[in-house]
Amino acid sequence: MNALSIPTWMVHVSSVIEWIVAIALVSRYATKAGYGHWRALAWGMVPALVSATCACTWHFFDNASQLDWLVTLQALTTVIGNITLCLAAWWIYRQSAQPSAPKP
């Protein structure tokens, strides 16, 4: 656990917490506002959360060489996360551009 300084740990852990809170808030917004297509954004954020968790786990175990596969998994989930976030943004744009029926 000594691989990172305390301020760097604070950044890593707060990033994971930030992703969790953001996913929860976006999901809640989708439900409360009735915009189900926003839920795609919440799901699109999950791979980025997995990526951040991989980084924290690897550093927690002092960058152990036995856990080098976590670095590969982090890279993969970062790419997947970037793609899913892009697709979610496109989906939200597409749904928002369609004329909607008036709400009662």
Swiss-Prot record:
InterPro entries: Uncharacterised_Ycf49 (IPR019634). It is a multi-pass membrane protein. Keywords: Cell membrane, Membrane, Transmembrane, Transmembrane helix. The chain crosses the membrane at residues 6-26, 41-61, 73-93. GO terms for cellular component: plasma membrane. The keyword Glycosyltransferase does not apply. The keyword Cell cycle does not apply. It is found in: Cell membrane. Belongs to the ycf49 family. PANTHER family: NUCLEOLAR-LIKE PROTEIN-RELATED (PTHR33833), YCF49-LIKE PROTEIN (PTHR33833:SF3). This is Ycf49-like protein.
